[in-house]
Every structure is written in C-alpha cells, then in structure tokens.
Amino acid sequence: MNHDINVKKMRLNCFRQSKVPGEFMLQMRVPGGMVDAKYLSYVEHIANTWGDGNFHFGTRQTFDITGIKYENIPAVNEYLEQYIKEVDAELCGVNMDTVAHEPQPWDPKAGYPTIGARNITACVGNYHCICGNCNTFELARKIEPIIFPSHYHIKINIAGCPNDCNKAHLCDFGIIGVARMTYHPERCIGCGACVRACEHGATRVLSLNEGTGKIEKDPCCCVGCGECVKACPTSAWTRQETKFYRVILGGRTA
C-alpha cells in the first residue's frame, strides 16, 4: 500500500524513518535511563504486536522499537498513553498540556507531542555506584519537565562523578556530580591509601607528611571525584552532605 507520508511529522511524534519504505522506529523516552521493570512489558507488546519483534537500547537510553508500519502508528500511539502518563507526567511531573511552557493541549491518544529535547541520559550514579557523588535519576527527573515537551534540539547527559562514564563532556549540557571532602585527622592512620588513589586515578593533590603522619592537601586542583573517600579504610575522608555539580556547555559532537 502506498502512503503519502509526512516524515517530519512522524519524527516530531518520536517515530524515526527506516531505510525500509513505510517503516518507522519508535523512541520511548526513559528520563535518566531507569524505570520500573514493569514497563518492559510495554516494549515487548509493541515490538511483538506492531514491530518486528526486536528493540534497541538507544544511544540516548531510549527504548527503540523497530519495524513499525506506518499504518500501525495510530494504534501504537494509543497504546503508549498510559506509559507516557506514568513515566513523564507522573514520575517526572511533566505538564503534557504545554510545549516549551506555552499552553498546547495534549491528545493522549496521539503519542508524544514533540521529539524536542532528546532523552536525558544518566549513569547509575550513587543509586548503586561506589563512585557516585549524586543521584543522577532524581536529577534527570527534575530536569525533564523543564525541557520537555519542546521543539529545542537539546541533549543533556548526567554523570555521577568526574569519571564521566556517561560522557557529559560530549553534549549540549553536561552535568557532573562532584564532592567536597572533609578530612578527619583523628581517624587517619597514615597508611597513604588516599595518596596512592589520588596519584593513580585523580590529580595528585594529596601527600603524606612524614613528620606528623597525616595527610596534606593542595585544594587548587582537586576535581571532587571522591577517590580518597573510597580508598580510606578508616573513613578519615568523607563527602560533605551538600551536593555540587560541574556544568559543561557546548560539547556536543553529533
């Protein structure tokens, strides 16, 4: 069957054109890259009912479902209603009746109103990782209602620490969780584990004073990674409760 397809309109609806004529790939938003496992049933149902039975973990942490025929897009959008309501509207607090913060009623049977700001990606952060300085998922969900829905082609990556596993340096807005450390000399046994960790994995700002057996720090070049905290066997280094972030602008490569 031949169709006169408005490809731009399909893209705004989060359906990417395939190299196969008349087929599209749905991109389901997953802000921060983590949702309840129950939502995998949505992916499975769409892939097996209207797609080709496969899905791809998108490079921006979306659920990308391939092989959807153009004529099946309305049915897919109608099925997506509950997912969008629960993940974007309820979990992230997105006002779906606005676009770029201007009133625009959303038709819940019509799928995503815009592709706009791309899905916010995040590493696992301190939800799981011993290196994480911040809860990346919570931050992503706070940012989501600020940038979505909109027509701005913005990419935001969140990294939980300066290791930058999520490549915050390579997007429009990169956010990196950093920490300020507090030294507790009364707990320090002078083992030098933190000095070695900083020398090997960070910026060599720590040194062991042989006279006092305590650690000295040159704060000028500390990147806030927290490697000293991770290495210390006696908790002589701890992260301060206040959260800090390094924001990087204009690093997008694609």
Region annotations inferred by a language model:
Residues 193-212, 223-244:
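Iron-sulfur cluster-binding cysteine motifs and their immediate structural context
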Residues 16-20, 111-116, 239-241:
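Short glycine/proline-enriched loop/turn "hinge" motifs that connect secondary-structure elements
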Residues 15-20, 51-57, 205-208:
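Short, flexible, solvent-exposed loop/turn segments with mixed acidic/basic and small polar residues
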Residues 242-246, 251-254:
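A hydrophobic, small-residue-rich beta->alpha segment in the mid-to-C-terminal subdomain
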Residues 21-23, 151, 242-244:
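A general secondary-structure signal for short beta-strands and their flanking turns/coil
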Residues 1-23, 38:
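Intrinsically disordered, low-complexity polar/charged tails and linkers
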Residues 2, 26-189, 219-221:
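Small-residue-enriched alpha-helical segments and adjacent helix-cap loops
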